[in-house]
Amino acid sequence: IVNTIIALSLPAGSVSAISLAFTWMLMPQVAIAQSVAVAAMPTFSAQAALGKLDELRTSLAGSLRGVLLLALPATLGLVLLRTPLIRLLYEGGSFTAQSTQMVAWALLWYALGLVGHSLLEVIVRAFYALHDTRTPVMVGVLAMSLNVAFSFVFARLFSVWGWMPHGGLALANTLATLLEMSILILLLRRRLGGLGGTSVPRALLQGGLGTLAMALVLLSWLALTAAQGEALRLVGGAVLGVAIYAAVMLALRVPEIRSVLLALRARFEKKPVH
């Protein structure tokens, strides 16, 4: 809402661009983080009610690991495939090549906040399980205030640098969200006496390595298919990206990816009942 209001004072098309870009950032966030957070909430609540903080720490760390391992490659996918995605789905008629550039520009900066938005879904629910709604609200108000301030600052800076200014609004949202997530996770870590040791940082490292490998392959793919149709570039890039990331996760023996693959294998091998 804040970004939309400020975008009204920016060049034509800015409001539509940030609205559509934000929607695309939210899609993986809803699919990844909300599903994990909603599923974890009953467990968090039961463990908190019984005073089993050790178990709550373990459950929370597991949820954060799962979200990280999915949000990192999703972020890269949005960043590198954003232009083929928007061009293929929307370009034509009144939605011009300039419209594609404006949406893709905003999506670049929004996508960088996907990890922060996703982790927040889990972290906030952990506070709720501890019957603490005040802390997330207070930190959220602070983040909203920072978002407003950052929006004015970065919209102005982007204009000075010769960049499309609405991208500054998306960057402001990303920075405010990352700060909100960081503050809440530090407060939660202090309250619980830790967050599962090194398991979450290890997931960040593992996911980072997989995402790096994915980036190298996707950049090569996009360079090789520069003259090809957007459908081939988008679908081929997505398939390659998922395959490379999954391969790296398997090579690193990441338990979450092995569990997912075993579940898929069991589902496909299940014989139909006649």
Predicted regions and their residues:
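Membrane-embedded alpha-helical bundles of multi-pass transporters/translocases
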Residues: I1-H274
